[in-house]
Amino acid sequence: MAAAEALGAARYFTRWYKADVKGRPCEDFCVLQHSNRICVITLAEAHPLLQPGKTITSINYQISPNCSRLQNKVSGKSKRGAQFLTELAPLCRIASSDGEEYTIYSFIRGRLIEVNENILSNPALLQEKPSTEGYIAVVLPKFEESKSVTQGLLTPEEYKEVLLKRQNSSSGS
């Protein structure tokens, strides 16, 4: 499946946000939920990696010595072979030129359908087109959990409020 092609049809996606993942300020993620329940994990606009002056130096899907998201081999209608992810499962690690490293988490329970290998050779896609060709991964929630997958996530309007509060608290100090 070419997720980047599917992303072109934005009208089929509902945008949800998760702010301050694992208590890390501004490390926000976005999930684009398709009408067929597939979820595309992306960086949210306020994520530090998307701020001016940041340069991505490397992206690593090797999570531990025995776990690489690149080894995820999916086949068939039931997506056999897909790695199962919990909400806190790391998808990849991204390093920037200022020495910072960011762990990107799934925050969606389900099967890992695809990781975006294009960003390995062209990391700038993450910053230039974070909601389309610069996506991180595609996750398929369990059918029975597909309705509850967005519990605890923010709508675009709620996320804007979070960003406004951050802006007001930083300008007030």
Swiss-Prot record:
A biological process from GO: dendrite morphogenesis
Keyword set, alphabetical order: Actin-binding, Cell projection, Nucleus
Main localization category: nucleus
InterPro entries: Abitram (IPR039169), GCV_H/Fam206 (IPR033753), Single_hybrid_motif (IPR011053)
Compartments it resides in: Nucleus speckle; Cell projection, Lamellipodium; Nucleus; Cell projection, Growth cone
GO CC field: dendrite; filopodium tip; growth cone; lamellipodium; nuclear speck; nucleus
Top-level taxon of origin: Eukaryota
GO molecular function, one term: actin filament binding
Annotated family: Belongs to the ABITRAM family.
Function per UniProt: Actin-binding protein that regulates actin polymerization, filopodia dynamics and increases the branching of proximal dendrites of developing neurons.
Name used for this protein in its record: Protein Abitram
Organism per entry: Gallus gallus (Chicken)
Gene: ABITRAM
